[in-house]
């Protein structure tokens, strides 16, 4: 499984997001995240913290989302040009995608 992950991530690593290539980069990102079962992180807003008295299952689900969100956000930043990294470094993965879609999704 690790070899599959590495080879799929190479899709993103071969050409960093520079703005012009958003549609291709986004397609490749979705392929990688789907294989890693983390695609939900760019599709769902950050959940509310369930709090200390919440059931264990809710806490575990929240922790998994936060951990996956961190992994995906770092992957996204690592596959962007330095200028785009600076613009997005204080955002979580979901916010990055929403912002990038606003800017670039009109590309044809």
Could you say what each language-model-derived stretch is?
Residues 1-108:
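N-terminal Lys/Arg-enriched interaction segments
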